[in-house]
A protein has these predicted regions:
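A short, N-terminal "cap"/entry segment at the start of jelly-roll beta-barrel domains
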Residues: 1-29
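Short, surface-exposed secondary-structure edge patches
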Residues: 44, 53, 68-71
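Ligand-binding loop in jelly-roll beta-barrel domains
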Residues: 82-107
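Conserved short histidine dyad/triad with adjacent acidic residue
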Residues: 33-47
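Glycine- and acidic-residue-biased ligand/ion/polar-headgroup-sensing regions
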Residues: 50-61, 66
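Histidine-centered active-site/metal-ligand motif
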Residues: 46-48, 52, 86
């Protein structure tokens, strides 16, 4: 097992909402999360103390962050400061996003 190149089965997989699955890989100070959203699935409004930045890598979704709403597609990036309410609704194509959290989200380990 390599410290630098994780195996495909390393990390953890969770269904966080119906139709929304995450695959995570923690480091000492941050966490990588691959979020796969089925068509029309929803990440319900929530907030957390972690900073979050991300990029849509496939499909498209409506992001609502701090009351501001925007449709984001492949290559679009976003940032969610600590404590800011946010939600995501996948469109008909579904969506895949890559998120980075700081610090590590213990609830996703």
């Amino acid at each position: 097992m390599s410290l630098y190149f994780p195996e495909e089965n390393e990390g953890s997989v969770h269904q966080i909402f119906p139709g929304v699955q995450i695959r995570t890989l923690p480091a000492s100070e941050m966490m990588l999360s691959l979020v796969t959203m089925q068509p029309n699935s929803v990440v319900q409004p929530h907030s957390h103390p972690h900073e979050q930045v991300g990029m849509v890598v496939e499909g498209s979704a409506i992001f609502c962050i701090g009351g501001e709403q925007k449709v984001l597609g492949k290559g679009a990036m976003y940032r969610i400061p600590s404590g800011v309410l946010h939600e995501v609704k996948a469109l008909e194509s579904g969506a895949v996003a890559l998120d980075i959290f700081h610090p590590v989200r213990q609830d996703y380990l």
